[in-house]
Regions:
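Signature aromatic-anchored transmembrane alpha helix within multi-pass, membrane-resident enzymes
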Residues: 22-25, 30, 51, 292-300, ...
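Transmembrane alpha-helical segments
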Residues: 55-64, 303-306, 423-452, 505-507
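Active-site lumenal/periplasmic loops and adjacent helix-entry segments of GT-C-fold
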Residues: 56-221, 260-264, 441-451
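Extracytoplasmic
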Residues: 83-84, 442-634
Length: 634
């Protein structure tokens, strides 16, 4: 009665017989009170935190703008090797090309030449969400990516703020926690990054979730999904529960067609929450099953067309995405962090500070256990697909989120229900935010020469775009007149960000199904041959981490992952012998298999002795630091 009287005094105007019994969870009680009071200030800190994170996300771009000044050519700063591929696919869609397209080979889906599904055409939602407004506004892919980086940070911060506010009921903790999760999530992905901090070294990209356009564009949906599931489980009215469950199911359905490593992580997390809820809170199985049923019905409805698209994928897609068969467990850094958090949580329950039945405790437990489940699903399924992505884009953030929730719950329990001191939260937040800003600024400074070189090289892509607009509409699809050889591989990789012409070979050519594994190898050898690479240089590149080692042996073997076979001398010698045979037998017929239309070389080092044996070059056109040639077969 005393508890009910207390609630009645706080909720004036309500009849005593209409007041529901108070919820045991402090987070749920505060949530209920905030809804009744309608306090408009509770979002103010969240919006401020989101704006701060958006500005933090743009620090590298600010650095490029300041260093280039009026010479800026419109390039976006990139910290991730794969961003140029997403920008190329986005540019293709913005240019009106079909969903199944290959921006590197220039091959599009057509009735007389159907293309198989690719990773990008299956996960099409983010691409079209960006491409449609970009096309309507006439925005190039680079500008879209710049805007997306800020918007993604803003939305992710707001989603995290909302989720933490639901769980903890503490607005200040929610704002500080959102910043902490986003700034420290990258650090939780790799143990070597923690060591670099202790030794005052740079940790690299401290905000990996901002990789564009995935997971950046849909990253916030993971936390939105968790918040909707919370609402569906803790709300009292059945109709409200089912409404939130339906919204959660729709969010999960969108994630399915957005990014594999987010929707599978969300599904694994939902499984953990469901098991915890059914085991610990046995008194409400009917409502929990109803909520899960609604979510799973919508999930299954989306999974069916997804499976159909997946069945139409290219046969080489599994190999290009490094799908392997293994049941070996993986103990990554996020897994260790999550298990340690779970141990702390269990200790707090054992000491009587917390209770398992508290929904906030169950949610903290679910986030702590998510890395162990996500990284080790192969123990059950037998399939292992690039688990490193869980460590960069989902499980690492879940482990830090668990730390924030557990820290807030324990501190509140030890302080007899009072909130964490505002000054402590402010100090910790400022330290974390300042460190992340320093890391982003330092990395932008270190990569400044590369960013400026990419920006200057964009002149070449824009010149090719101009030439395509001057050419007949059928010429671009004709590889004999438009195929580009670029001796600078990183420039060639980025050319399709703006230019519609296909390229001979780039490190990302294998990603799309436009070329088979055999054609990809043929194009690689041609690229090396025209670049005057001999067998000794080939062997040297194959022995060390390089674009060649990546192309020949794959990312996971190059990075010496424990579940991948090591690269030994016999492997290098075998590949070198194959390339040597190619050099020895190269002839006019092989040159004609992939006829070139354009050649791009640096203005200071444009040796093309092998290419000149088979092609005639025009006088060339100086474009920035490069020379653009038009070539024809002899």
């Amino acid at each position: 009665m005393l508890a009910n009287e207390s609630v009645a005094r706080c909720c004036t105007g309500l009849r005593r017989d209409k007041i529901r019994p108070p919820l045991r969870s402090l987070g749920v009680r505060r949530l209920t009170e905030s809804f009744k009071q309608g306090d408009p200030i509770r979002w103010r800190l969240g919006v401020c935190a989101a704006i701060a994170m958006a500005l933090l996300a743009l620090v590298p771009q600010f650095h490029l703008w300041a260093s280039r000044g009026k010479d800026w050519q419109g390039t976006f700063v990139s910290f991730d090797f794969d961003e140029v591929v997403y920008a190329s696919y986005l540019n293709a869609l913005t240019s009106g090309r079909p969903r199944r397209n290959d921006p590197y080979t220039g091959r599009d889906d057509a009735p007389n030449q159907p293309q198989p599904e690719s990773l990008y055409s299956i996960q099409f939602v983010p691409a079209y969400v960006l491409a449609m407004p970009a096309r309507a506004l006439g925005l190039p892919s680079a500008t879209t990516f710049i805007l997306l980086r800020a918007l993604a940070a803003f939305l992710a911060t707001l989603a995290l703020f909302w989720l933490l506010m639901l769980i903890t009921g503490d607005t200040q903790l929610a704002a500080s926690g959102a910043i902490a999760v986003l700034c420290l999530g990258g650090l939780a992905g790799e143990p070597r990054d923690a060591w670099r901090i202790l030794t005052f070294q740079g940790v690299g990209d401290s905000l990996p979730f901002l990789r564009r356009f995935v997971p950046a564009s849909v990253f916030f949906l993971f936390f939105l999904f968790a918040g909707l599931v919370w609402q569906a489980l803790v709300r009292l009215a059945p109709q409200v529960r089912l409404t939130y469950a339906a919204l959660a199911g729709l969010t999960l359905a969108i994630l399915i067609f957005s990014y594999f490593f987010l929707w599978t992580a969300a599904l694994a997390w939902l499984f953990i929450v469901a098991m915890l809820w059914l085991i610990v809170r046995r008194g409400e199985p009917g409502s929990v099953i109803a909520v899960l049923g609604v979510i799973m019905i919508l999930f299954a409805a989306a999974l069916w067309p997804y499976a159909v698209l997946l069945s139409r994928r290219d046969s080489a897609m599994d190999a290009s995405q490094l799908l392997t068969h293994s049941r070996a467990p993986v103990f990554s850094f996020p897994v260790i962090i999550g298990l340690l958090v779970f141990l702390v949580l269990a200790t707090a329950v054992w000491r009587g500070w917390l209770r398992w039945k508290d929904p906030a405790v169950l949610f903290a437990t679910s986030f702590a256990l998510l890395p162990a489940v996500a990284f080790n699903q192969q123990v059950v399924t037998g399939l292992l697909l690039q688990p490193v992505h869980y460590g960069r884009y989902s499980a690492n953030y879940a482990s830090v989120l668990a730390i924030v929730i557990v820290a807030g719950l324990i501190c509140r329990a030890r302080a007899s229900g009072s909130r964490l001191p505002s000054r402590v939260l402010a100090f910790v937040t400022i330290v974390i935010f300042s460190w992340s800003a320093l890391e982003n600024g330092a990395r932008a400074y270190r990569l400044g020469p590369q960013s400026r070189a990419r920006d200057d090289a964009r002149r070449v892509a824009m010149r090719l775009r101009e030439l395509s607009q001057q050419a007949p509409s059928t010429q671009i699809s004709d590889q004999s007149s438009s195929l580009v050889f670029c001796s600078n591989l990183w420039l060639g990789d980025a050319l399709p960000n703006d230019a519609p012409q296909p390229v001979l070979w780039t490190p990302h050519l294998f990603i799309f199904p436009g070329s088979s594994a055999e054609e990809n190898r043929e194009r690689l050898y041609s690229q090396l041959y025209y670049s005057d690479v001999d067998e000794e240089q080939f062997a040297a590149l194959a022995r060390e981490p390089s674009f060649l080692q990546l192309a020949v042996f794959g990312w996971e073997r190059m990075n010496q992952k424990p579940y991948a076979a090591p690269i030994v001398d016999a492997d290098v010698q075998k590949e070198t012998n194959l390339f040597k045979d190619y050099l020895t037998n190269f002839n006019a017929a092989q040159a004609a298999r992939t006829p070139l239309g354009y050649v791009i070389v640096p203005a200071t080092n444009g040796s093309l002795s092998n290419l000149d044996l088979w092609y005639r070059r025009d006088a060339g056109e100086r474009v920035g630091d490069y020379i653009l040639y038009r070539v024809k077969l002899r």
